[in-house]
Amino acid sequence: MATRLQIRQLGFVTDIRETRLQRLLAEAIVALDIAEAELETAGRILIQRRHDAANAKIDFARKPESEMIRIWRDVCFQRLSAAETADEMARLECDDAKARLIKARNDVLRIKERGDRITDLGKVLRRAEAREKEARVEDENPGGRANILMLEGSE
């Protein structure tokens, strides 16, 4: 059986872990908000690039008689028109933002699961503390609660 000091120490450790998890959860939620904003921005960039390409405002310094060869984010865009290149670049940016968003959501879920486990541990510790208090009352009063009730009723 755990001593009172051990139970208090475990309760203190649990409180520290809950605080750390709350901080991690807050950071993960901020990262999720940032990832969502990046995804939204990437979507706006995609729309703007498609609009610009449709209006032939994007040329990427391509000479009219030559092929356009452009490497961007380790992707080689060969024999693509300016509009197709802009569309592909925007799609890649959007995919990156989606991947960051999914990672941030997974981080939030993982931290919430850890928080739930620590909260459960805290509940177990509180139950142990309550049992210890009951045992302490029983030790101080060997007759138990019935004895206390009989004494109160006789007054």
Where are these regions (language model features)?
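Charge-rich amphipathic alpha-helical interaction elements
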Residues: 1-155
